[in-house]
């Protein structure tokens, strides 16, 4: 219905936004609907965190494949659009220089992002997942695999932060995020030797590590034959401060620093050959942030929730000027090329 009704006006279609987050939080930790998990993973009334995430993910992958197949066979030729999927993409650094921790990075990436992208683009689950999970991974039929190969036109990358990955396959780990077999036996941690991987933000899961942006783009470029990419989400959050003055809430210097460093990292990846075609800041406005509700603010524009008044933050003015300056530079380069 969407292709038929809006295809003449929509150039880019995304079948899912962050399906890895939806599956992990809905069927492993249970903090998202339908809130299914084992007691060792969360507080749920029912569920199996060791099997259900993989069944749910498998169905997401197949439904993505069906949507892409429909679009390509019935609409793409006449409408001229592109179709892809948007993934939440974390970068990981090895906790140490050991081979075990370097392999833990590969498992962390495979059990979080490649879990979906490998079947959709390469037609099979990652080797790291097959080795650890075996028959717990659902199987694709021959028809599924044929449909899945090159099953998108672009990859949407939602990237905010990075972590360390520590081996739990050959070492003993405390039972935290990533350490279990169903998560890839790769402990996800933000600190090493008492230091965070990057400057902590007020939002407890964002650490400022712009190197991770360049590295995740380069990794995706190399693994998936430089499939076109869009940075579909990237941004910096502050905690809600109800007693602060309005002027202080608009002076978001740390957001400006974050955006500048991450945009520079994207530019570096592009100069090295990555086919990145667009960038979307999260977010234009303060908004309802899923399970965090109105307790976190990501907007370039401040929203007074009582009156709904919008006010430009420092970051909005900076980003407007950044785009204007980059546009002028590009126009200058094109003019020089025309003269030559």
Model-derived segments and their meaning:
Residues 1-340:
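Active-site region of glycoside hydrolase catalytic domains
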């Amino acid at each position: 219905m969407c292709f038929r009704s809006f295809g003449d006006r929509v150039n880019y279609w995304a079948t899912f936004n962050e399906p890895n987050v939806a599956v992990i939080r809905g069927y492993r930790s249970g903090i998202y609907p339908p809130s299914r998990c084992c007691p060792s993973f969360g507080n749920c009334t029912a569920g199996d965190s060791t099997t259900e995430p993989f069944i749910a993910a498998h169905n997401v992958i197949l439904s993505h494949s069906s949507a892409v197949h429909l679009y390509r066979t019935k609409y793409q030729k006449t409408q001229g659009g592109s179709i892809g999927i948007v993934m939440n993409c974390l970068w990981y650094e090895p906790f140490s220089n050991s081979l075990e921790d370097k392999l833990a990075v590969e498992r962390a990436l495979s059990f979080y992002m490649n879990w979906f992208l490998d079947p959709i683009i390469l037609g099979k689950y990652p080797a790291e997942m097959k080795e650890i999970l075996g028959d717990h991974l659902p199987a694709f039929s021959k028809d599924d695999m044929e449909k899945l190969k090159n099953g998108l036109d672009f990859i949407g990358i939602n990237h905010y932060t990075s972590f360390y990955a520590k081996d739990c396959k050959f070492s003993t780990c405390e039972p935290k995020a990533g350490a279990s077999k169903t998560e890839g036996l790769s402990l996800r941690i933000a600190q090493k030797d008492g230091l965070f991987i990057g400057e902590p933000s007020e939002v407890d899961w964002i650490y400022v590590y712009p190197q991770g942006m360049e590295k995740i783009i380069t990794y995706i470029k190399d693994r998936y034959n430089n499939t076109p990419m869009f940075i579909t989400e990237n941004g910096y959050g502050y905690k809600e401060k109800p007693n602060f003055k309005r002027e202080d809430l608009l002076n978001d210097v740390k957001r400006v620093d974050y955006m500048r460093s991450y945009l520079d990292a994207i530019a570096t990846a592009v100069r090295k050959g990555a086919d990145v075609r667009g960038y979307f800041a999260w977010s234009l406005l303060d908004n309802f942030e899923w399970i965090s509700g109105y307790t976190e603010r990501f907007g370039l524009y401040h929203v007074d929730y009582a009156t709904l008044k919008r006010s430009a933050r420092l970051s909005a003015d900076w980003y407007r000027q950044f785009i204007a300056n980059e546009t002028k530079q590009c126009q200058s380069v094109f003019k020089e090329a025309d003269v030559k």
